[in-house]
Amino acid sequence: MLTQNYLKLLSVDGVNRFCSKPYGFELLILLYDFTKNNDEYGIEETFEMIHYNKCKRPAFLSFIKDLEAEGIIFRIQSKVKKSRSLLRLNQDTIDEIDLKNSSDEL
């Protein structure tokens, strides 16, 4: 069942792009939670939260720029600290992930 759920998630355009990197799925989970909960974690804090298969900071920032260019994620300014940029998944990706997860419950 877990394999089927994972394959369903990979059918979401944004999700399969995240999974092109060894740390991508963990990053996806973090950004999903940050977006849903409106958490105030900046880019550097997000990088530090990745525990498995972590890359070097320049490679991470390059991947973030690629995801932004593809419209999968975007940056917003923190309301708490103006110098902090927050990463968010786009709403279409969130909706597709939620749809895939809710179809499992049926």
Language model: regions and residue ranges:
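Alpha-helical ligand/cofactor-binding cores
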Residues: S62-D66, R88, I94
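A short, conserved structural fragment
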Residues: E68-K79
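Minor-groove-contacting beta-hairpin "wing" of winged helix-turn-helix DNA-binding domains
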Residues: V80-L89
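Short acidic, hydrophobic short linear motifs in intrinsically disordered regions
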Residues: N37-I50
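Short alpha-helical segments that sit at the start of domains
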Residues: L2-L30
